[in-house]
Swiss-Prot record:
<dbReference type="GO" id="GO:0008616">
    <property type="term" value="P:queuosine biosynthetic process"/>
</dbReference>
<dbReference type="GO" id="GO:0051075">
    <property type="term" value="F:S-adenosylmethionine:tRNA ribosyltransferase-isomerase activity"/>
</dbReference>
<dbReference type="Pfam" id="PF02547">
    <property type="entry name" value="Queuosine_synth"/>
</dbReference>
<keyword id="KW-0671">Queuosine biosynthesis</keyword>
<keyword id="KW-0963">Cytoplasm</keyword>
<dbReference type="InterPro" id="IPR042119">
    <property type="entry name" value="QueA_dom2"/>
</dbReference>
<dbReference type="GO" id="GO:0005737">
    <property type="term" value="C:cytoplasm"/>
</dbReference>
<protein>
    <recommendedName>
        <fullName>S-adenosylmethionine:tRNA ribosyltransferase-isomerase</fullName>
        <ecNumber>2.4.99.17</ecNumber>
    </recommendedName>
</protein>
<dbReference type="InterPro" id="IPR003699">
    <property type="entry name" value="QueA"/>
</dbReference>
<comment type="similarity">
    <text>Belongs to the QueA family.</text>
</comment>
<comment type="function">
    <text>Transfers and isomerizes the ribose moiety from AdoMet to the 7-aminomethyl group of 7-deazaguanine (preQ1-tRNA) to give epoxyqueuosine (oQ-tRNA).</text>
</comment>
<keyword id="KW-0949">S-adenosyl-L-methionine</keyword>
<dbReference type="InterPro" id="IPR036100">
    <property type="entry name" value="QueA_sf"/>
</dbReference>
<dbReference type="InterPro" id="IPR042118">
    <property type="entry name" value="QueA_dom1"/>
</dbReference>
<comment type="pathway">
    <text>tRNA modification; tRNA-queuosine biosynthesis.</text>
</comment>
<comment type="subunit">
    <text>Monomer.</text>
</comment>
<keyword id="KW-0808">Transferase</keyword>
Length: 352
């Protein structure tokens, strides 16, 4: 499909720079592609009223790390050069894949010093991607990164304001526990203890999977056709216990409600052709565009995404391209707040 089919104009004033407070007071656009009322404006705290007892919410429990590192390139016979690296996927106890800027100033064999944390450029790939081999390893490396790193705010926020101490709380879900993400699973940012309590009272199950969201989630689609786009890889895990529990939900007639596109991509990666979920522990590069047949997820809660992004393609596959174009036009016109710190939506899958 042509990538420009997924384009739309978004005014700057619709881009959220801070989250709603309280989190569950964010606006909530209900999208029913096959319903008599296609669009409905609500608030996130009303989520339980759109679900049924026996449904299951699936959350991504990854935890954002301060993966933005500022350093100096050291090369024999050359001047020290400032570089910025965003870690995006751990590949060994002492090794991370990262996106470096400016990438053209870095080559294999360079050493980068991040304020006392040293790394060797073990490999150099395309589009500024490098493999960093650190002098520290395991928990020692984790502590060192936490000490020198910064929260890697999305480019559309970082371009408008610097990171501050509030972001370390705001850009983290209340249930985050598995360290390794470069970006937050942002649909989950709307959940509060009060909303969890309301969901419990409504008989809605909660289950957790882990997908370590990488910096590739912010990469623009440069191809003109979706067939030519290469999707980034992210490491994910679905336990045998979670797969079994979700299969039981489906067997009882309950619905799988994915909190965020990261949970959805992982569940669809772990699903067999008949829709049964299997244990999963691997990297996924699943790229979902219109025409994809969803196997596991029935309902999707998700924020509002960038024009021509892989995530707007995903929601268009889930609820229909024309439905989502209408939903986004309504959201823009009525002042919904977009992107990571913005408002949310609840999409019911289009099956016709």
């Amino acid at each position: 499909m042509r990538v420009d089919l997924f384009d739309f104009d978004l005014p700057d004033e619709n881009i959220a720079l801070r989250p709603a407070n309280p989190r569950d007071q964010a606006r909530f656009l209900i999208v029913r592609p096959d319903g008599s009322l296609m669009l409905e404006d609500r608030r996130v705290f009303e989520l339980p009223s759109f679900l049924r007892a026996g449904d299951a919410l699936v959350f991504n429990d990854t935890k954002v790390i301060p993966a933005q590192l500022e350093g100096v390139r050291i090369r024999e016979g050359a001047e020290r050069t400032p570089v910025s690296c965003t870690l995006h996927m751990r590949v060994a106890a002492n090794r991370w894949k990262a996106f470096a800027r400016p990438g053209k100033r870095i080559k294999q064999g360079d050493v980068i010093d991040f304020d006392g944390l040293s790394a060797n450029v073990a490999e150099k790939g395309e589009a500024g991607e490098i493999d960093l081999e650190f002098a520290a390893s395991g928990p020692d490396l984790d502590r060192a990164i936490a000490g020198v790193g910064h929260i890697p705010l999305p480019p559309y926020i970082a371009a408008k304001r610097p990171e501050d101490s509030q972001d370390r709380t705001d850009y983290q879900t209340i249930y985050a526990r598995e360290e390794g993400a470069v970006a937050a699973p942002t649909a989950g940012l709307h959940f509060t203890p009060a909303l969890f309590e309301a969901l419990d009272k409504a008989g809605i199950e909660r289950h957790f999977v882990t997908l370590h969201v990488g910096a590739g989630t912010f990469l623009p689609v440069k191809a003109d056709d979706t067939d030519d786009h290469k999707m980034h890889q992210e490491i994910g895990h679905v336990s045998a216990e979670t797969a079994e529990a979700l299969n039981a939900v489906k067997a009882r007639g309950g619905r799988i409600v994915s909190v965020g596109t990261t949970s959805l991509r992982l569940l669809e990666s772990a699903a067999s052709e008949d829709g049964r979920l299997l244990p999963w522990s691997d990297a996924t590069g699943i790229f979902i565009t219109p025409g994809y047949r969803f196997k596991a997820v029935d309902v999707l809660m998700t924020n509002f995404h960038l024009p021509k992004s892989t995530l707007f393609m995903l929601v268009s596959a889930f609820a229909g391209l024309e439905t989502m174009r209408a939903a986004y036009a309504h959201a823009i016109e009525t002042g919904y707040r977009f992107y990571s710190y913005g408002d949310s939506s609840l999409l019911f899958r289009k099956d016709k």
